[in-house]
């Protein structure tokens, strides 16, 4: 059953808004975000086309859709080539006290089914809350559609009493992952400074603060204690690259 004229006008207005945003992002060379908006806007215009009866309007819509599809295809080819050449770079700036940046929100678009191996370099997987951060990251990998089988962790060793806590905590995580068919390889370095995460599908994510970018929750029963999307963050920068040939630690 065709939509009413009012419904079509509403859909058309929404499509125009999304495509206007796509053009703005395109002009700013923010191609990855522009592509998403183009694709969403095109889908919306196709729905409008289905409900349009007047031939002249249908012809106009087809012309617009064709133009947007051509531009989206060109952007996709450009991004694919950037990935092929190892030149792709996207930056996300997390503001002080920003929310909505759980590990799942940040990493989900890069964890395709082809991911089977992950490398993590982070010097600060030592204190209790940092061990929990790493555990949450591992939980995300287990839940995602990817079939992760090996996780490599390179971190720095804690000193004194903290060393026992660190080693026992990581060993417990290792045993837990093993029960899910995942091998955790742990290595220590006293000279490690960089923080980066790599997936064997070519994606590499560098976070200024590593996995430790969440603020301490206000209390054990406050929002954000369990759901990291609700947890305020420290200010940091996330740089995302793509390289077909990811190096191993």
UniProtKB/Swiss-Prot annotation:
Note one Pfam family from the annotation. MIT
At the top level, the lineage of the source is Eukaryota
**Keyword vocabulary terms for this entry:** Cell cycle, Cell division, Endosome, Membrane, Transport
**Annotated signal sequence range:** none
Q: Which residues form the MIT domain?
A: 8-86
- What is the annotated quaternary arrangement, including any partners? Homodimer. Interacts (via MIT domain) with CHMP1A, CHMP1B, CHMP2A and IST1.
Q: What is this protein called?
A: MIT domain-containing protein 1
Q: Which organism is it from?
A: Rattus norvegicus (Rat)
């Amino acid at each position: 059953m065709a939509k009413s004229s009012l419904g079509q006008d509403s859909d058309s207005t929404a499509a125009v808004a999304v495509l206007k945003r796509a053009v703005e992002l395109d002009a700013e060379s923010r191609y990855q975000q522009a592509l998403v908006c183009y694709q969403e806007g095109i889908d919306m215009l196709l729905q409008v086309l289905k409900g349009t009866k007047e031939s002249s309007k249908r012809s106009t819509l087809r012309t617009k859709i064709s133009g947007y599809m051509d531009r989206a295809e060109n952007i996709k080819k450009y991004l694919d080539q950037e990935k092929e050449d190892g030149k792709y770079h996207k930056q996300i700036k997390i503001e002080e006290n920003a929310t909505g940046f759980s590990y799942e929100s940040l990493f989900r678009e890069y964890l395709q089914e082809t991911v089977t191996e992950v490398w993590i370099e982070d010097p600060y997987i030592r204190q209790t809350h940092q061990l929990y951060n790493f555990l949450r990251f591992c939980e995300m990998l287990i839940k995602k559609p990817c079939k992760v089988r090996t996780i490599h962790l390179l971190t720095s060793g804690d000193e004194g009493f903290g060393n026992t806590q660190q080693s026992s905590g990581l060993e417990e995580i290792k045993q837990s992952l093993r029960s899910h068919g995942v091998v955790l390889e742990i290595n220590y370095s006293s000279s490690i400074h960089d923080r980066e995460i790599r997936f064997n599908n070519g994606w590499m994510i560098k976070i200024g603060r590593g996995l430790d970018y969440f603020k301490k929750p206000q209390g054990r029963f406050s929002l954000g204690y369990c759901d990291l999307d609700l947890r305020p963050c420290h200010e940091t920068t996330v740089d995302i690259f793509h390289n077909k040939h990811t190096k191993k630690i």
